[in-house]
Amino acid sequence: MQSKISRLLTNASELCEDRKYAKALKYYDKVLQIEPDNLKANVDKGVTLQNLGCISKAIQMYEKALILEPENLDALINMGSALHTLEKYTEAISCYNIALKLDKKNSMALVYKGLSVGETGNISKAIKYFKKALSIDCNYDLAQISLESAKNIINSK
């Protein structure tokens, strides 16, 4: 049974790489019919739904994943990203804070937190998060682009 689940997850992942999200959902649903508590399927289905713009449904998948494993970094960071998309910046920041308590050097959580903090109007604090992320991963494009954008915002005032 595990090999079947593994094949289904691989197929879904490959479809996502090809941006065939609706088809990928069918594979995640098959996995979840067999094994409703499959953490990877719950998180990855959430990501796929988020890519399709189904943010509320994505959040439901992340919530289920976090019930299964409350300290799952992927679920926490993706939940924060989905909440950010809904402009729920404070809630998004809470997700990133939990992720950063678990892994204080998680550059993605730092950048995403910086983006949400920036949206609340605190650009100088956002810059600190972008710089911290770059101190961990100097090649992180999103951190570099976000830092430059934030500096441009401050310089234009």
Task: Report residues per predicted region.
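Alpha-helical segment of the N-proximal tetratricopeptide repeat
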Residues: 3-40, 47-51
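Helix-start (N-cap) detector for alpha-helical repeat units in TPR-like alpha-solenoids
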Residues: 5-6, 39-40, 73-74, 107-108, ...
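Register position in tetratricopeptide repeats
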Residues: 17-18, 51-52, 85-86, 119, ...
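Canonical positions in the second alpha-helix
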Residues: 31, 64-65, 98-99, 132-133
